[in-house]
Amino acid sequence: MTYWTSEDNVAGKPGTALFIILPTIGCYRYRIGQACYMCSYPTAAPKVKWTQEAIVNYVKEALEKIEGTEGPFAVRMFTSGSFLDNGELKPETRRKIFEILAEMDNVEEIVIESRSELVRYEAVKELAEIVPDKHFEVAIGLETANDDVADVSINKGNTFADFVKAAEITHKAGAKVKTYLLLKPIFLSERDGVEDAKESIIKAEPYTDTFSINITDIQKGTLYERLWEKKEYRPPWLWSAVEVLIWAKRKFPNKRILSDPVGAGSKRGPHNCLTDYDRVIGKAIKKFSATQDLSYIENLKPECRDRWEYIVENGLLDWQLVTW
């Protein structure tokens, strides 16, 4: 397991995020053979189960990376599953972790992840009460507000109504909601992927404090990888991500719009024409995400943009493309 720091947006201003991958047993959907089609994260879960005490000690070790350092810092904890799943983290383990974070003045934001159906009022409330002066978000993987896309293209296992219920519980319990959306699930054209993201943002906006646009990358051992290998799926164009981010920030200027383009400029990640400029765009997206300053992505050189525009305007499917 691992942890690292990266430039990021912290409670609405530029700062640094400490990302911690907690060594739990991973997502229960994966354990019952119903993993999301794009996700291989649970395969990285430890083969030997860690004790709850060892997990707490691991968090302490990770926090040493920012201890005594001037912030602001966000601590974002991932489990390759759900932080609120009692099968991964016991309630007392969650409390111990939050009690440690409560004592760190340089940590202004805390983010945990959970599937919708695992969000429970008491579980969120007790954590929110431990860190009343910090920006505490529960990140929920909505992926799309279209239930058909969620079922056929993602195998999500829950619905938009489930998300709404979880978001309302989270707010009532005293925490904020971060909504994960997946840009361009399989079986959608580039145009439909962009439109699905925009429509999902509109539907989820009343329940959301922060949007995180997850730009699809190809993870090993997934259905997405199999379709990609057969040239029936192409990761999103970076221009699609830029389009969605600019549109979202202009439409909802008071919402925090985040995105981390994993693998930008590589064949497995979001890319345009696989030139060096793809990585420039990827870095610009990260700067926008950290600062919320649209100028980083509004003034990009339109390299390869004409190809993207042709594909989007004509609604071409990935298997119809000659070049990737």
UniProtKB/Swiss-Prot annotation:
**The protein's required cofactors:** [4Fe-4S] cluster
Fetch the InterPro entries from UniProt: ELP3, Elp3/MiaA/NifB-like_rSAM, RaSEA, rSAM
SMART domains registered for this protein in UniProt: Elp3
Enzyme class, broadest EC rank: lyase
Q: Where does [4Fe-4S] cluster bind?
A: 27, 36, 39
Tell me, in a sentence or two, what this protein's role is. Radical SAM enzyme involved in the synthesis of archaeosine, a modified nucleoside present in the dihydrouridine loop (D-loop) of archaeal tRNAs. Catalyzes the cleavage of the C(epsilon)-N bond of the lysine moiety of q0kN15-tRNA, leading to the formation of archaeosine at position 15 in tRNAs.
Q: Which family does it belong to?
A: Belongs to the radical SAM superfamily. RaSEA family.
Q: Which PANTHER family match?
A: ELONGATOR COMPLEX PROTEIN 3, HISTONE ACETYLTRANSFERASE-RELATED
> What is this protein called in UniProt?
Archaeosine synthase subunit beta
